[in-house]
Amino acid sequence: GSFRRFERIAVAFCAGSLLLIPVYFLAHPHATQMARNFVIPQLPGGSGQLATVMLLVIGIVGTTVAPWQLFFQQSYVIDKRITPRFMKYEKADLCIGIVIVVVGGAALMGATAAAFAGTHGLGHFTDAAGLASGLQAYGGRMLGVLFAIALLDASIIGAFAVSLSTAYAVSDVFGINHSLHRGVRSAKGFYAVYAALIGAAAAIVLIPGSPLGLLTEGVQVLAGVLLPSASVFLLLLCNDREVLGPWVNGRKTNTFTAAVVAVLVTLSVILTASVLFPSISSRQILEIMIVCGAAGVLAAGYTLTRRLRGGGAAAAVDRAGQETWRMPPLALLQRPAMSVGRKIGMGALRLYLGVAMILVIVKIVQLALGH
């Protein structure tokens, strides 16, 4: 095993994502329209199609900020064997990756919108093959080939990251030796899980008539639905002083994370309403967003009031010793105390997860059956 070799190969494939930039310019999309819709988004489709649109929106969130990434990143950084003094470099690495993903996603959306606008293929392709064919028909063979190469590149990155994330998680849970620094003989279980996942994914792709586009969308929507729970789990962990010491979250980070979770839950509520009431209108969706926003403001006000009554601002975090901090061994950590409010919140989150996942599956089945 060689972590350095794996990372160099992965970075080379990540650079391949930049192929989407020439795809964008070859398609000649309307940049002004993209800029306007970025600031003032619109929901396409009539009232009966809004459920499908919301499914797509949550899927985009799920594929951009996938919950498995939260666990992959911490396992990968640990496997890299770097110390906290390199944290600034890791943050810079993360920011560069975010920029590449956002630029690539925007380029792909702009190119496909330009290629399919006003054509018979608009809304009638179901997978990446249909997308590539449409791009080639619109901009020539070079456009289609570049997209196909970028798609293959992204698929390999996904196979690397998702399978590795699961292998890390399974090995952590069962106490199996796991590291890319180890060879196959010293980490058989880790590499077995890794290889089995890649093999299973390849087998699904090779099944004749497999609805790959629908499967992809369904998986990403489930990722978007699972993201709030993963974010809450991460938020609780990031506020545990015994685990993170001087690295615990500050108030600004907690506020931002809570807002992100609130937005994701709001999207899931809208998806729930659109599945239960297929004829829901865009105005009713706006009303749901207003109600959820008001509920969030009330919750924030209640939390602030309770904190002020309890003795004012929270104790300042001592950031001294960040570069030398090490988490105590797991066996020495105390079980975290769960307040009544936290127990109620976790119970509500479990209920949300169960209902949202069932409704996502129902909607995916409806799409598969053509309803």
Residue locations for each model-derived region?
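Hydrophobic alpha-helical segments and their helix-loop junctions in multi-pass secondary transporters
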Residues: 1, 14-45, 54-74, 233-240, ...
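C-terminal membrane-solvent junction of multi-pass transporters and transport-like membrane proteins
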Residues: 3, 9-12, 180-195, 217-272, ...
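A generic transmembrane alpha-helix motif of multi-pass inner-membrane proteins
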Residues: 50-55, 252-312, 350-357, 363
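Helix-loop junctions at the membrane interface of multi-pass solute transporters
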Residues: 61-90, 114, 172, 236-237
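Junctions where cytoplasmic loops transition into the N-terminal start of transmembrane alpha-helices
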Residues: 77, 83-106, 355
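Loop-to-transmembrane helix boundary motifs in multi-pass membrane proteins
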Residues: 96, 100, 142, 146, ...
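Membrane-helix boundary/coupling elements in multi-pass transport proteins
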Residues: 105-108, 113, 144-176
